[in-house]
């Protein structure tokens, strides 16, 4: 149905990908590397690929890695600290999958601060709200350490295209292309993307479009 609608609309595509990822932070990078072994991926980023907020994350990543810790303890600490604002299902999912995510980062080549006196082999710290030492880190620049490794992986992967200084200005959706498209079949085909250096708009089509542009910082007028 998706490509049938595209053909009906006479949409001219400059580039076509299996997955279009808008945003070049750790979320977008991680998804790209997981998909790229079988898919053609494009990452669009409005500045240079290393200019996002991910590199500014300092403290570390929480994961229940020690034998005396567990995802259930991690969940309990998070729900208490969240004071009723946490989505319990999402909290459970993140806590259960955090150790696996850490091991994946290590496999990619991320060097976390070591501590041979710890059973895990890594230095774990304890931050506010946590009842256990479960913060794994890379010095005091964890985000930067992770980002640098993933950027190297991204740039060297033959199935990943990175377009810097490109900004998505609108999503291409079925309701915009075909006025009589059934609402139940509403889909996204890609995005119109502005090349900021050439001042030219291109049409990028994709079977899947992912928004990985960071937090919703404009939900409130002022944020800290």
Per-segment meaning from a language model:
Residues 2-19, 37-38:
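Extreme N-terminal leader/targeting segments of oxidoreductases
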Residues 15-17, 199-208:
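Core beta-strand elements of the Rossmann-like FAD/NAD(P) dinucleotide-binding domain
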Residues 18, 45, 220-223:
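A short, small-residue-rich loop immediately preceding and capping a beta-strand
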Residues 19-43:
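N-terminal Rossmann-like FAD-binding beta1-loop-alpha1 element of flavoenzymes
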Residues 24, 139, 199, 219-224:
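Alpha-helix N-cap/helix-initiation motif
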Residues 24, 166, 207-208:
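Structural detector for helix-capping/boundary residues
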Residues 45-197, 212, 218:
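Conserved N-terminal/central alpha/beta ligand/cofactor-binding core
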Residues 208-224:
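Glycine-rich loop(s) and the adjacent beta-strand/alpha-helix scaffold that form part
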């Amino acid at each position: 149905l998706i490509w049938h609608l595209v053909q009906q609309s006479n949409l001219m595509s400059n580039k076509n990908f299996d997955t279009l990822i808008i945003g070049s932070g750790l979320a977008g990078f991680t998804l790209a590397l997981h998909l790229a072994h079988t898919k053609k991926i494009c990452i669009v980023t409005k500045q240079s690929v290393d200019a996002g907020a991910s590199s500014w994350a300092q403290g570390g990543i929480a994961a229940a890695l020690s034998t005396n810790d567990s995802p259930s303890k991690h969940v309990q600490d998070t729900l208490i600290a969240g004071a009723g604002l946490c989505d319990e299902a999402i909290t459970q999912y993140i806590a259960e999958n955090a150790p696996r995510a850490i091991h994946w980062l290590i496999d990619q080549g991320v060097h976390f601060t070591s501590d041979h006196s710890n059973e895990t082999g890594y230095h774990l710290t304890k931050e506010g709200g946590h009842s256990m030492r479960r913060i794994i880190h890379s010095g005091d620049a964890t985000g930067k350490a992770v980002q640098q490794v993933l950027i190297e992986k991204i740039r060297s992967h033959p199935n990943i295209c990175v377009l810097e200084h490109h900004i998505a200005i609108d999503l291409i959706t079925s309701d915009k292309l075909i006025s009589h498209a059934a609402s139940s079949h509403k889909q996204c085909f890609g995005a119109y993307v502005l090349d900021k250096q050439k001042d030219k708009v291109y049409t990028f089509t994709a079977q899947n479009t992912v928004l990985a542009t960071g937090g919703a910082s404009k939900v409130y007028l002022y944020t800290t």
